[in-house]
Structures are given as structure tokens and as C-alpha cells.
Amino acid sequence: VYITGSSEKTWSSPLNAHAGGFDTFIAKLNNSGIRQWHTFMGGSDHDNGKGIAIDGSDNIYIAGYSYATWGSPINAFAGYFDAFVVKLNSSGTRQWHTFMGGSSWDYGKSIAVDGSGNIYVAGYSNRTWGSPVNAHSGNVEAFSVKLNGNGALQWNTFMGSDDSDYGKAI
């Protein structure tokens, strides 16, 4: 059993230290609910894990959003709030992470992994970014993203009206 979210302070003995502000946390529980490990990731400001998926090799994928850059991402932080994806191995060690978004706010809310190791994220943005299949056309647009197993962006697309549209699950 895995859980993700955000925490304002450190607790217990994490694999990776709390950096400050709100950090994303990931915890592994056994079948009896006993925590096996937990780790933090993020920068000195607001980082929030919102979605979690596990692949056939027990790798853990987290989707969320960050207010500042951290670590050495595949794709750089672009500004304000950016969506992110993090891949951890089954022991909780970060394998890679990447940011997705533009100069305004972009929120990753949900994540899924297919049998070939491709990663899909749903979320929402209030500005365009990348080279989308369908252009951003409104105030807030739902988005979907496909990353390959190494975290490289394969495509992104926007959908919705000229008002507010929110992608929250995939």
C-alpha cells in the first residue's frame, strides 16, 4: 500500500529529508498498515503529491505540482506552479523526476502507467505549454500528457471550453 500527499514538517526517520515549506511525501505500508518507509521530495516552498500509480515492477509514480524547482529534473521548472512526475523504485529511491508546464500554474492531479511503461497524467493549466496536440483555448483547460518510461514527454494535449475545465482523474 502506498500513499502520497504533502507535509509541512518532517516526521519519523525519512529516506530523504524534508526540504522546507510543504514537501511531497510518499509512504509504503505493509498489509497490516505498518509504515515500511517514507520519503520527502520537493524544494523550499509548496510541493504536493496528488496521484500515485505502481507499475508491474513495483516502481512508484507520483503526479503533483511544485511552486519551485528541486533536484535535477529531466525537464526544467518553468514557473509559478508546475506539474511534476516522479519515479521511485520499490525501495523509495528516486529514479528521476520531470516538470511539465509553462509560466503560470499547471497542476498534475492523477497518473496511470500502462503495460509498456508509458505514463499518463491528467491535470489542468491556465496557459499553454509544450507543442500540444490540441491547443489551449480557454481560461483553465484540462490536460493529458504521455511520458515514456524514462520521463521524456511524448505528447500533451488540452481540452475544454473557453471557461474553466479541470482534468482530475485518469
Question: What name fits each language-model region?
Answer:
Residues V1-I170:
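A sequence-level/structural motif corresponding to short, flexible coil/turn segments enriched
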